[in-house]
């Protein structure tokens, strides 16, 4: 059977763990009128209760659902049957019949661990015996538990014997069909836990010593600082299961102690175990659809953090233009950006959604590739309907639904129309080189989720200053960057006083053309006007960061810094190179290209007190992933039919591996040529750059260059050695991945969606796709 690899999680440690008080006797517990309590057995003179959480849409007479029963922890000595109530409620809401079961413990009945195991098996047997009445599939019953309860659960699926001879349905199997184990006690050897309590029954009662190919699929959660269950024990258990051909998942949470999965210890870990339990059961085919983060949010004792989010996106800033990313060949000083990077996490393999402006901005706000719309190549020019349809959810609409105030200060570049304020007539670009003062905007940012907008449409219209839905003045373009700095700082100061979380999107005007550094920045770099403009841009970033810090909200604010694509040819790239500055660092190409220089971008995140400083991530991420990442951060569900190309990389913020949510990442050049990145392989459906760097496509065809390019990005980051002819199988696989992702309307996990157009051309360099 297929198995998963071990994932290790780095999360903030707490050094105490929750215990649950022992009671003097076993009594019926009240969970509410929606929970049914029944006695599943009587032992040691006490009635043992099992509590059923029923799916709302479940008809037991005709519907057979999978079931799960949870056993509390407490060292076989005590514990509360309420420990896993929220997990039971969650899984019932997701469609399973969920139970929490009481069982005998030393403090109440004076019984040893063997009695706990007997009761666990009796509970599973009781559920299977009554499966028809309860509407349960008798072949899909999971046992779950934490600590000693994890031992009980594991024993029901792995250990033979230990059945209560007084069970009324002794002929019915007590074996669980899946195991959900939270820091379980599953090694009872002399070097394990509890050997002194189970000496006579060892090794038969020790799950780790009884693994066979018949064992059920298992998921285990463990903290790396667990003093009772060593990580080595968990790894050995996982390896033994996999070697036996049993499907196994192990998640180790770095720095976490025993009991870490309880919300009172680590809300983040608690949430994560909900999600991964759901995904595990989904893998087994017991659940359908994605985890319900909104329900998890409702079940939490305390609301999850709602940090302010400041997203700063430069325009045409190259990867190598940030000095800390290009220490050898970066000649432009960027102290503020470097400081931001040092204070948080650097993503070294981050990409824009496209190698050019408009598509990247569309992808950021919608979580969807722009080529799924009417715009198949190039950029928009304004004076036309907004590229984001009114019904499509955006990051801004989603955040606003969660109580955020939202603002954009800067460049929109996603089209909107202008109306004459007197007549309501739509204005045409041919008659208005610059939108007139007073022109109204019916479909701008304030109609796509933003409460406030101050900025401009794109560089050619930069003189027209817009606030909310109106052109308010004309101003010289040299003043735009200082204006955006002033407006952003003012917004942060005002929003910080409201005590309401805010999302501020700052798509800067620089260092895109027109390259217009302010007078005090002219000549500062000693390199070129472009370099001066980059230095001024760095200063603006510093002003925004200072505003956050001076308002005392750095602990509650996630700052993201990036660029929309690589550096433009307008920077005079060759002249800068002659002076020792490489705008793309070690990468080939620049803005508009399929090569890395076109779309590999600086990407930093700072969240003081949450993201560790001086850290980095080599996960392959994309600006388009921000929608899913923000939704994940806020424990909220991505709206239906939204963010089809967005995959959360939230675990990376904590130093954790990011689970695969897609086969690969799709790249696109200014001319619409496609590329596909999967692991360290990158396929380009172009003979040349696909953009502005030589050889362009027509010249590459004349030179009879191969129709495809395949690079090993890890071994050849400069994309100098085309391996397509040597690895045709890999090129073909990546091509099929790309083809599938295009036609199914999404590149991430989930149901197929619809593209806005049926005319997406996979191959842009001829009438038919050449054979691989």
Regions found by a protein language model. Give the residues of each.
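Catalytic histidine neighborhood in serine/cysteine hydrolases
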Residues: 242-259, 455
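Short beta-strand element of the alpha/beta-hydrolase
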Residues: 63-74, 310
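Formylglycine-dependent sulfatase
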Residues: 116, 227, 235, 244, ...
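N-terminal cap/lid segment of alpha/beta-hydrolase-fold proteins
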Residues: 25-62
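Short amphipathic alpha-helix adjacent to the substrate-entry channel of hydrolases
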Residues: 81-100, 332-341
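Alpha/beta-hydrolase active-site loop
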Residues: 111-132, 275, 387-393
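Primarily recognizes the serine-hydrolase "nucleophile elbow" in alpha/beta-hydrolase
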Residues: 122-198, 202-203, 207, 434-435, ...
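Short beta-strand/loop motif that positions the catalytic acidic residue
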Residues: 220-222, 226
């Amino acid at each position: 059977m297929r198995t998963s690899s071990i994932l290790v999680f780095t999360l903030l440690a707490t050094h105490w763990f929750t215990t649950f008080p022992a009671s003097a006797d076993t009594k019926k517990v009240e969970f509410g009128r929606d929970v049914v309590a029944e006695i599943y057995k009587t032992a040691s003179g006490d009635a043992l209760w099992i509590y059923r959480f029923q799916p709302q849409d479940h008809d037991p007479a005709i519907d057979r659902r999978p079931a799960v029963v949870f056993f509390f922890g407490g060292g076989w000595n005590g514990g509360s049957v309420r420990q896993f109530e929220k997990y039971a409620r969650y899984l019932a809401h997701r469609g399973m019949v969920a139970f929490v079961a009481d069982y005998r413990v030393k403090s109440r009945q004076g019984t040893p661990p063997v009695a706990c195991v007997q009761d666990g098996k009796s509970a599973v047997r009781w559920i299977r015996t009554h499966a028809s009445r309860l509407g349960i599939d008798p072949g899909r019953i999971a046992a779950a538990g934490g600590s000693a309860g994890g031992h009980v659960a594991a024993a029901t699926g792995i250990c033979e014997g230990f059945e209560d001879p007084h069970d009324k349905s002794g002929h019915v199997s007590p074996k669980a069909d899946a195991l959900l184990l939270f820091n379980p006690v599953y090694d009872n050897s002399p070097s394990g836990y509890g050997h002194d309590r189970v000496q006579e029954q060892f090794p038969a009662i020790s799950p780790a010593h009884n693994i066979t190919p018949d064992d059920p699929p298992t998921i285990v959660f463990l903290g790396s600082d667990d003093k009772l269950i060593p990580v080595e024990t968990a790894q050995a258990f996982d390896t033994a299961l996999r070697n036996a051909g049993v499907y196994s998942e192990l998640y180790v949470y770095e720095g976490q102690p025993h009991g870490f999965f309880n919300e009172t210890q680590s809300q983040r870990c608690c949430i994560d175990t909900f999600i991964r339990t759901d995904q595990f059961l989904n893998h087994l085919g017991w659940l359908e659809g994605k985890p319900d983060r909104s329900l998890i949010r409702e079940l939490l004792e305390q609301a999850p953090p709602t940090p302010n989010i400041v997203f700063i996106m430069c325009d045409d800033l190259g990867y190598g233009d940030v000095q800390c990313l290009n220490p050898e060949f970066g000649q432009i000083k960027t102290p503020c950006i470097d400081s931001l990077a040092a204070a948080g996490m650097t993503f070294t393999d981050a990409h824009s959604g496209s190698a050019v402006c408009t598509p990247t901005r569309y992808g950021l706000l919608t979580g969807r590739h722009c080529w799924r719309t009417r715009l198949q190549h190039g950029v928009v020019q304004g004076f036309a309907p907004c590229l984001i349809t009114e019904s499509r959810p955006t990051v801004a609409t989603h955040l606003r639904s969660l109580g955020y105030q939202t603002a954009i200060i800067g460049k929109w570049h996603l089209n909107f129309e202008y109306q004459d304020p007197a007549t309501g007539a739509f204005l045409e670009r041919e008659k208005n080189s610059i939108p007139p003062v007073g022109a109204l905007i019916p479909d701008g940012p304030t109609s796509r989720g933003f409460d406030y907008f101050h900025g401009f449409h794109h560089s050619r219209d930069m003189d027209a200053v817009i606030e909310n839905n109106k052109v308010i003045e004309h101003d010289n373009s040299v003043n735009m960057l200082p204006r955006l700095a002033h407006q952003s700082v003012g917004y942060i100061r005002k929003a910080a006083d409201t005590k309401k979380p805010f999302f501020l999107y700052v798509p800067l005007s620089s260092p895109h053309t027109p390259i217009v550094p302010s007078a005090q920045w002219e000549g500062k770099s000693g390199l070129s006007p472009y370099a001066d403009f980059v230095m001024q841009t760095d200063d603006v970033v510093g002003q925004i960061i200072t505003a956050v810090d001076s308002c005392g909200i750095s602990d509650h604010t996630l700052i993201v810094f990036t660029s929309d694509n690589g550096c433009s040819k307008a920077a005079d790239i060759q002249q800068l190179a002659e002076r020792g500055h490489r705008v793309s660092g070690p990468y080939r190409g620049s803005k508009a290209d399929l090569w890395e220089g076109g779309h590999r971008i600086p990407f930093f995140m700072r969240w003081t007190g949450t993201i560790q400083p001086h850290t980095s991530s080599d996960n392959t991420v994309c600006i388009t992933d921000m929608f899913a990442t923000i939704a994940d951060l806020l424990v909220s569900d991505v709206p239906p039919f939204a963010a089809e190309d967005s995959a959360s990389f939230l675990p990376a913020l904590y130093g954790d591996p990011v689970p695969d949510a897609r086969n690969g990442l799709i790249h696109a050049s200014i001319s619409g040529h496609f590329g596909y990145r999967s692991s360290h392989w990158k396929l380009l459906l172009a003979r040349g750059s696909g953009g502005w760097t030589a050889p362009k496509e027509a010249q590459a065809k004349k030179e009879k260059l191969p129709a495809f390019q395949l690079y090993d990005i890890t071994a050849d980051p400069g994309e100098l050695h085309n391996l397509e002819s040597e690895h045709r199988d890999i090129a073909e696989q990546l091509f099929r991945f790309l083809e599938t992702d295009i036609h199914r309307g999404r590149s991430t996990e989930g149901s197929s969606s619809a593209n806005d157009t049926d005319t997406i051309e996979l191959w842009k360099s001829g009438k038919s796709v050449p054979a691989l």
